[in-house]
């Protein structure tokens, strides 16, 4: 057994998962939330695996409410949960701790062993990700105190996209201003895009280095990435996760002049504009609901707002698919992943129905058929293979953390 603890920390909560990287099975997972509030909540789940890997694990979940004043207290609660409910960290002591960090800027292009200097650099990059990096740093500091003798590794969402050429990541604004404020496209969901593109190549038994892939990570947050030979060459998210596709609550691409209009006419502050575009836009802004399942249900019932929201979502998605087909000079593989991508046959069908000219042909029965794991949903004759690949960012973080720790 080679356990790696994966931490995904925010400002008021953190998720954790203990993964055996030998078997790639989850041993336990949990969520500590409402940190700093009067009453916090800690949930811990233990997984029990049999000899047959094909048989789903059974699990036992426990939950408790108690004051959790800060992340250090939260980690103490997590350790108590392992001690009380298992697995015992004496028997399954982590060989490494992997931390998800959203923004690594141009500085971090690979998973990195965390030192005091790395902590300082992550803190400095908080200017580019004020909603994410500070919470990650709180988790890192608490985890390093709780597991002082274990290597800690930062895995950056942005790292996978550091292979983009300058033409893809450069914004056409004043160069000196852009350099001074580090304004450029960084991209996000990189850990997922890396995991999924590699899993697709392995499933097809084709060399990753030979494939042109378009990976569509469609969840509440959504991004598209053009992957050539295993490297990101373009991606839809930009300086922040706001740019690109229509999302659950984010607008995606928008004329920047809209911000000036709202600032002048509604006297909105920069913070209010950020909140407007990130939390009150996207599907929620168009139809009052951020969940694609609700949008599709209401669309089927004839709701005009849900219908328009779905149509705008698909229009934007097709635009990016078409753009990346042009950037790559065609594609070998298109991959759908994350909550919407893995579960909405309607979104997948609508997104690809106009791309027959590019050799993309869905098999309707395969697309509609529910299934677990990786599955092909294109026809046998389709020149471009279309796959559904469940993402597993925690497993990818565990793999990368173990690789760095074992050096």
What positions do the PLM features span?
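Short glycine-rich, Thr/Ser-proximal phosphate-binding strand/loop in the N-terminal lobe
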Residues: 4, 13-68, 238
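Glycine-rich beta-strand-to-loop/alpha-helix junction loops that act as flexible
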Residues: 9-10, 99-103, 218-220, 331, ...
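Phosphate/pyrophosphate-binding loops at sites that engage ATP/ADP/AMP, CoA/4′-phosphopantetheine
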Residues: 81-95, 200-207, 320-332
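Short beta-strand-loop/turn "lid" adjacent to the catalytic site in phosphate-handling enzymes
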Residues: 82-132, 151-153, 159-170
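Glycine-rich phosphate-binding loop of actin/hexokinase-like ATP-binding domains
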Residues: 160-265
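Catalytic phosphate/nucleotide-handling subdomain of diverse soluble enzymes
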Residues: 227-269, 275, 338-369, 375
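A mobile "lid/hinge" subdomain adjacent to the ATP/sugar-phosphate binding pocket shared
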Residues: 265-309
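Internal helix-turn-beta structural module
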Residues: 307, 311-329, 335, 341-407
């Amino acid at each position: 057994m080679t356990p790696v603890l994966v931490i995904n920390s925010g400002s008021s909560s953190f998720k954790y998962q203990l993964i055996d990287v030998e078997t790639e099975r989850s041993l336990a997972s949990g969520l500590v939330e409402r940190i700093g509030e009067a009453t916090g909540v800690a949930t811990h789940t233990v997984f029990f695996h049999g000899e047959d890997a094909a048989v789903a694990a059974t699990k036992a979940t426990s939950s408790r409410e108690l004051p959790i004043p800060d992340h250090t207290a939260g980690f103490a609660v997590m350790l108590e949960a392992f001690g009380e409910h298992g697995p015992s960290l004496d028997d399954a002591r982590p060989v490494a701790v992997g931390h998800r960090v959203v923004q690594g800027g141009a500085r971090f292009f690979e998973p990195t062993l965390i030192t005091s200097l790395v902590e300082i650099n992550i803190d400095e990059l908080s200017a580019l990700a004020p909603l994410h990096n500070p919470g990650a740093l709180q988790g890192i500091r608490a985890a390093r105190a709780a597991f002082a003798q274990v290597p800690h590794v930062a895995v950056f969402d942005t790292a996978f996209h550091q292979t983009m050429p300058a033409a893809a990541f450069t914004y056409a604004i004043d160069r000196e201003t852009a350099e001074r404020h580090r304004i450029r496209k960084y991209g996000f969901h990189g850990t997922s895009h890396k995991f999924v593109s590699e899993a697709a190549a392995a499933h097809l038994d084709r060399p990753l280095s030979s494939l042109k892939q378009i990976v569509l990570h469609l969840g509440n947050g959504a991004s598209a990435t053009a992957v050539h030979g295993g490297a990101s060459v373009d991606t839809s998210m930009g300086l922040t996760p706001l740019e690109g596709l229509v999302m659950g609550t984010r607008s995606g691409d928008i004329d920047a002049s809209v911000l000036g209009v709202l600032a002048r006419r509604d006297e909105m502050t920069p913070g209010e504009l950020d909140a407007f575009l990130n939390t009150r836009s996207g599907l929620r802004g168009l139809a009052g609901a951020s969940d694609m399942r609700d949008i599709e249900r209401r669309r089927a019932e004839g709701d005009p707002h849900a219908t328009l929201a779905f149509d705008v979502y698909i229009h934007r998605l097709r635009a990016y698919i078409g753009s990346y087909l042009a950037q790559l000079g065609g594609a070998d593989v298109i991959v759908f992943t994350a909550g919407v991508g893995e579960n909405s046959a309607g979104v997948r069908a609508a997104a690809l129905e106009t791309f027959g000219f590019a050799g993309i042909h869905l098999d309707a029965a395969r697309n509609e058929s529910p299934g677990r794991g990786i599955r092909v949903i294109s026809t046998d004759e389709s020149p471009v293979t279309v796959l559904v690949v469940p993402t597993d960012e925690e497993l990818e973080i565990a793999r990368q953390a173990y690789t760095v720790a074992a050096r």
